[in-house]
């Protein structure tokens, strides 16, 4: 699709807005991924897992909940957790007597990796995203994206 308007055109089509959103989010993710690899030695998917665990109560999550929060398929999550377990960043443990339910638990080493990577990630986000728009625009984006995300989370795909 070829753009026929400027970003200030009030009647941009949903397709044009989607294209801008999609391209920007892909570009920003690539920049964050590159910075994490260069400065921390790991990638954005691993950072996403570390973030979910670092923000969880007791630094642990049930694997199903971790997959939901990171938007990973169970097989992709399992592969990534295996990589991270080898680095000593986390452990996968059975939950009590239920051998079918497993948790991922963040280790001190994993928390340290997260804390240094969070600084790198936030620097890129500030430079390429938050620092480029007004607080009013950021608030509007949050309202729109939160509403859309909430709808998707309720929808079974």
Question: Locations of the language-model features?
Answer:
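Charged, amphipathic alpha-helical coiled-coil/dimerization segments
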Residues: 3-6, 82-140
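N-terminal positioning helix adjacent to the helix-turn-helix/winged-helix DNA-binding module
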Residues: 17, 45-47, 109, 137
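Short, hydrophobic-biased segments on the C-terminal half of alpha helices
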Residues: 63, 81-82
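N-terminal leader segment of winged-helix/HTH proteins
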Residues: 1-40
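C-terminal regulatory/oligomerization modules of transcriptional regulators
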Residues: 1-12, 135-157
């Amino acid at each position: 699709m070829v753009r026929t308007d400027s970003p200030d055109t009030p009647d941009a089509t949903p397709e044009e807005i989607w294209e801008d959103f999609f391209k920007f989010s892909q570009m920003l993710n690539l920049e964050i991924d590159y910075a994490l690899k260069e400065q921390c030695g790991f990638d954005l998917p691993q950072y996403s897992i570390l973030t979910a665990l670092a923000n969880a109560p007791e630094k642990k999550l049930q694997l199903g909940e971790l997959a939901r929060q990171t938007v990973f398929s169970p097989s992709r999550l399992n592969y990534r957790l295996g990589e991270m377990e080898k680095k000593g960043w986390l452990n996968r443990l059975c939950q009590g007597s239920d051998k079918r339910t497993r948790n991922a638990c963040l280790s001190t080493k994993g928390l340290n990796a997260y804390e240094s990577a969070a600084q790198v990630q936030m620097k890129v986000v500030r430079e390429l995203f938050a620092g480029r728009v007004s607080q009013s625009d950021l608030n509007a984006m949050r309202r729109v994206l939160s509403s859309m995300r909430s709808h998707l989370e309720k929808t079974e795909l």
